[in-house]
Amino acid sequence: MRPSIPLLPVFLAALVAALLPASAHADGLPVLGIDVGSTGVASNANADAARYLALPAGGRTIVERVAQRGGQILAWRSLPGTFTIPAVAYDGSAGGLSADGTTLLLIEPRVAFPRATTKMLVLNSDSLEPRRLVTLRGDFSFDAISPTGSWLYFVHYTSPTDPTRYLVQAFDVQRGRLLAKPIVDPKASGEKMRGNPLARTMSADGRWAYTLYDGAGATPFVHALDTVARSAHCIDLDGIAAGTDLWQLRLRIDQDGKRLVVRDSAAPVLTVDLRTLRVARATAVPAPLGASRHLPTSLFAGGAGLLVVLVLSVIWMRRKHRPTRTSLASVRRVREPTAGQ
């Protein structure tokens, strides 16, 4: 007989997650106070588009797949431990879902910086069944995932006091191996990246992850990570005027997919030619291609989050559907993966 979890705690957990502000922890980034578990991460916009949520429930995590249209709960599962959807930048951008919709990654929420170990859980995004539990020695956050979910990219914080010092490392999901060699721009001439990740956007095919960094007091730059080729480029944004509030800047890709647009709340500031990586001052830029893969927290908490709560309450009252309660005992584990090339 399949074990089940009482639905009243699930309902209450969802209610709290939807109505209260984000809890005082982060989902991997090196500061506290950012948690996108209740806002989730969305699949590419199509007829089967779904949003994935992770909600705390009494020492466990309820992970859900919710239809973008209509808000129906398509699948949900109860997992032991506390995990959440990873944020990849301080603008609240969410990550962890492969572009082909097959793989979802959750991360253990951060309660302090630095942390001695980092746990992440790789799930089948359809069944929400765990595929691999990854335990890494050291402080890591999630950065990106390749389109098929075969490669993960982690930010490894190398200083116990300065979260702007880090390396980007690749993780082979099939082999359970963290590659020792960091991913760097071959043209960087030994200069190490530093900075806070302020904003993120992805290419339409999910291959390229573009992250805006503040440069830690130096020149702001965009980190362009090729998640298929396991390579990267650092694009200096020298054209940003002195005194610009970098934390208000956002990234978008234009309609034809050829230019990355750096914009503030009022207008485009710079553009980057994605073929040549040349930076230019922005002129008239078409509207961004498609919608962002994350929603503002306030919008979701006030609208779609309440919709999830209502759906959960109906399920609770009818008691017809119960989530699968999963143990991680039989899940493939990776603990301190062997480094390799």
Please give the residue ranges for each predicted region.
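Alpha-helical transmembrane segments
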Residues: 306-320
